[in-house]
Design a protein with these regions (language model features):
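Intrinsic disorder/low-complexity signal
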Residues: 1-37, 512
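Class II aminoacyl-tRNA synthetase-like tRNA-binding/catalytic domains
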Residues: 2-6, 32-299, 466
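Hydrophobic alpha-helical scaffolding
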Residues: 53, 177, 248-251, 261, ...
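Short aromatic/basic micro-patch
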Residues: 131, 352, 479
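Ca2+-coordinating acidic residues in Ca2+-binding motifs
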Residues: 136, 357, 484
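Alpha-helical packing segments of well-folded alpha/beta enzyme cores
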Residues: 183-187, 304, 311
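Metal-assisted phosphate- and nucleotidyl-transfer catalytic regions
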Residues: 208-238, 310-430, 453-473, 511-513
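TRNA-recognition modules of translation machinery and tRNA-sensing kinases, especially anticodon-binding
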Residues: 245, 249, 254, 262-273, ...
Length: 513
């Protein structure tokens, strides 16, 4: 152990030195951004791993990963993380130079919140170019190791779901959160750079975009006694007496609403929460999740497919560039081969095949491969079929088109055969369906006929039909489940582990304790 040497004078490094651009908007450097706290990311994630800052006085704030005493207790190594990066920064405390040395040691071992000021020096240890030699340490939050649920090193993901309010402090969920952030930022970047307008669509709605009926009801009448809830003569709840005067629900998709702006602003997208009242406990479904739904005017299915493929590749590339440390962790701990899989996505064109061609491939494969559900024309393919195509047959993403109209939504444009629609799904390894999209039916008479065939309520869709009555335009779009995208780029197996507070039947994560 080398002696902790602190120069008598050391230039203090503050945030604007690293990121001066954040101060341009207000010019209030000292008042706003000069907080005398540097993100660990801005030190060790630089090209030289922080060596250019050696000799600078800096202040960091974060939480302890470990505290280890050395030299008979004269020194202590404090491993700090502030969530800005996967990597930690080691800080060295000298009992003779940190006045509250014993207080720091008594504060706990894991999860203690500290603010540490010191000089950055070149580290003598292998694997860490720099370390921080502390001069001042402030204990902001103690953490009793006997009570802290994350005190031990490793926890199962199932256990972490029971303490969702604390699990962001773990390596795995922290890395997921950073990748999720990058995917969200990349989403806006992709569409904004291409001239799309971001539209906020409603969460409370009366429209069922999918026609599935698996929607949550929004009502204020449950505050009353059951016997006092208004009912119609046939015994059903009388929603005309409810808050909105009709049966209001939580949206399953923002697509129909965002189409209204597509027919005025051309290229638009929505990115927000959606809700499904499906009694599903699978690793691919949630009751509350986020959807990205672009709509493009003057666009056919070919345009739709091209934009969707570009979007997937753009997000994948962005994460690989900006979250290399997190992906290295996932490669080591979650999915060996993850990086090769993602590189293959970037370097290979997606396979294009029709639904009918896919059924033929699966039917032939069924002669030697056992599927839980045997493939046949008209089957709504499951994840076992989708993953077989992407992982076993083509070994890359697949864009499947021209589905039977019976298994797709009413708004999808009919092909000339009258049996299939101009729909497309993007299937990817590990996940199966990642994106679902279509060219929308722009002809009023055809759309009305489809609504009737599917026994849907035309009266609740009159506003949607107005888009075809007044200046109809050919347009296309797609929807992507954001959590599935995060699963795809991280290798995480369960969708409940890629959203901060997962909701599924009989569960509300952070409220389970």
């Amino acid at each position: 152990m080398t002696e902790v040497v602190v120069p008598e004078t050391a230039e203090e490094l503050t945030l604007p030195t690293v990121h001066p651009e954040v101060c341009k908007a207000t010019n209030k450097v000292d008042d706003v951004w000069k907080r005398r706290r540097i993100l660990i990311r801005d030190i060790i994630c630089t090209p030289d791993k922080g060596l250019s800052f050696v000799g600078k006085m800096i202040t960091i704030g974060g939480w302890t990963r470990t505290i280890r005493k050395q030299g008979g207790g004269k020194f202590a190594f404090v491993v700090m993380n502030d969530g800005s990066t996967f990597d930690n920064l080691q800080c060295v405390m000298d009992s003779e130079k940190v006045s509250n040395y014993e207080e720091v040691l008594k504060a706990g071992n894991v999860g203690v919140c500290l603010q540490i000021k010191g000089v950055l020096v070149k580290s003598p240890a292998a694997g860490q170019p720099v370390e921080l030699h502390a001069t001042e340490v402030v204990v902001l939050g103690t953490c009793d190791p006997a009570k802290f649920p994350l005190a031990k090193k490793r926890h199962t993901l199932e256990h972490l779901r029971d303490i969702a309010h604390l699990r962001a402090r773990t390596n795995t969920i922290g890395a997921v959160a950073r990748v999720r952030n990058s995917c969200a930022f990349a989403t806006h970047l992709f569409f904004q750079e291409r001239g799309f307008k971001y539209i906020h669509t409603p969460i409370i709605t009366t429209a069922d975009c999918e026609g599935a009926g698996e929607m949550f009801t929004v009502t204020t009448m449950l505050d009353e006694k059951v016997k006092d809830i208004p009912a119609t003569p046939d015994g059903k709840i009388d929603y005309t007496k409810d808050f909105f005067g009709k049966h209001a629900k939580m949206t399953v998709s923002g697509q129909l609403n965002v189409e209204t702006y597509c027919c005025a602003l051309c290229d638009v997208y929505t990115f927000g929460p959606t809700f499904r009242a499906e009694n599903s406990h699978s690793v691919r479904h949630l009751s509350e999740f986020w959807m990205i739904e672009p709509e493009m005017a003057f666009a056919d299915l070919d345009v739709d497919m091209a934009v969707a493929e570009d979007y997937v590749k753009f997000c994948t590339s962005y994460v690989m560039e900006h979250n290399a440390d997190d992906l290295a962790f996932f490669e080591k701990q979650i999915e060996p081969g993850l990086l090769d899989r993602l590189k293959n996505v970037l370097e290979s064109p997606f396979v294009h095949l029709t639904y009918t061609e896919a059924i033929n491939v699966l039917t032939e494969a069924a002669k030697t491969h056992k599927f839980e559900v045997q493939p046949y024309w008209g089957l709504d393919l499951g994840s076992e079929h989708e993953r077989f195509l992407t992982e076993q047959v083509y070994k890359r993403p697949v864009i499947m088109t021209d589905y039977p109209k019976e298994i797709k939504a009413f708004y999808m444009k009919l092909n000339e055969d009258g049996k299939t629609v101009r729909a497309m799904d993007i299937l990817v390894p590990k996940i199966g369906e990642l994106i679902g999209g279509s060219q929308r039916e722009e002809h009023l008479d055809v759309l009305e006929r489809r609504i009737e065939e599917m026994h849907m309520s035309k009266s609740t869709l009159e506003w949607y039909l107005d888009l075809r009555r007044y200046g109809t335009v050919p347009h296309s779009g797609f929807g992507l489940g954001f959590e599935r995208l995060v699963m795809f780029v991280t290798g995480m197996e369960n969708i409940r582990d890629v959203i901060p507070f997962p909701r599924w039947p009989k569960n509300r994560s952070e409220e389970r304790r």
